[in-house]
Amino acid sequence: MFPCRTVIAPETDFLSAAVKADKAGQAISLLKVISAKDLRDVSPEVLNDHLNNSGLPGSEDFYSNVLNPRVANEMITPYKAFFQKEIPATEAEAFRKNPPALVEWCRKEITINNELNSQRIPMSPMGVWKARVADEKSRNIFFVSMARSLGIPAWIDEVTGKIQYRSFNDNDLKNGKVYDVDFEAAQQTQAPTGTLVARY
């Protein structure tokens, strides 16, 4: 006979701490946007970083595009507190008010070298920050991670692969405009929108 042992999942400890910090609702929302596979692998350190450094909901896509630690197929890491510490407050505020400035910063500061990553395993966002050299995919993940750390809703579209963000310029994130990121363009363009009408 083997002795019985209770195994407590990392998210149980995480939720207990969140309840004590009066953040239970946001903690549950965070767990909801993380896939079942990621929940098995994610550490409490990652969960706490993204819960405590994502701000408060301000847009309809806050949970999926700010709070969510997953960007693409990178290893999930606790990067938000790191970026909030590393980026000077005045620069962070400038990026929030003008996200194209963040696009331009990435274009100028991150050197692209796709040949250094022949296995196509994405670098961590913090690794890109420290090295200032990355392949294009790692740079894209880095941009989204940095934007989310600043409270800017950002994502990589699962269908088109486009990097996108919702603009703060409208001061109304519920109706904020979505922009495509183009690191080669001098100016960022608004993503095309339209209405689909289906009759049957």
Range-by-range predicted roles:
Residues 124-127, 131, 161-170:
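Beta-rich nucleic-acid/ligand-interaction surfaces
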Residues 132-140:
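A conserved hydrophobic secondary-structure block that centers on an alpha-helix together
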Residues 121:
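Juxtamembrane segments of multi-pass membrane glycosylation machinery
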Residues 151-163:
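Glycine-rich phosphate/pyrophosphate-binding loops
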